[in-house]
Regions:
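Pyridoxal 5′-phosphate
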Residues: 1-169
């Protein structure tokens, strides 16, 4: 008989992270309690009636808790239905850095990424470049160096250096 999920996690080597839960994973008791409480709430957070306002308040508290854990602002926390929706949401060539619009020309991904990442989100498929991985599934660092060298490290128009140089340090 297999051990319960939490016991299985405790038995695993601390040097190894088991990530093959596919669409489910063991829940900590506190997470299970919070989930059951949320499932018992009848309100739609977008509704103005009392149940909706209560659901919106619970949703806001959850967003704030996640933001604290991540060191982010609550307004920057978005809940999605799963990895595919999240990848589609964040893999975009257009975003803002402060108030300034920024456009990325290329998305570099590792060949072992989840199919939703390989799809490239809102990037044009021609601008998604796949980097090879080694036998352990790690991105080949030489391929990263080659990719960085293949693109200008600085912009002669505005004197800005690419983030890749910061990452290299």
């Amino acid at each position: 008989q297999p051990p319960d999920a939490m016991e299985h996690l405790r038995m695993m080597n601390r040097q190894r992270a088991y990530l093959d839960y596919n669409a489910t994973a063991p829940l900590l008791p506190a997470a299970r309690e919070a989930m059951v409480a949320a499932l018992d709430m009848p309100g739609n957070p977008s509704s103005v009636h009392a149940e909706g306002r209560a659901a919106r308040e619970a949703y806001s508290r959850a967003r704030e808790a996640v933001a604290r854990l991540c060191g982010a602002e609550a307004a920057h926390v978005t809940f999605t239905s799963g990895a595919t929706e999240a990848a589609s949401h964040v893999l975009t060539p257009d975003f803002r850095m402060g108030r300034a619009p920024v456009r990325l020309d290329t998305l570099f991904i590792g060949a072992a990424e989840h199919p939703c990442v390989i799809a490239g989100g809102r990037f044009d498929p021609e601008t998604v470049k796949t980097l090879p991985v080694d036998r352990d599934g790690l991105i080949d660092i030489n391929a990263v160096r080659d990719a960085i060298q293949a693109y200008g490290a600085g912009n002669n128009g505005d004197g800005q250096f690419m983030l890749a140089l910061q990452l290299a340090n």
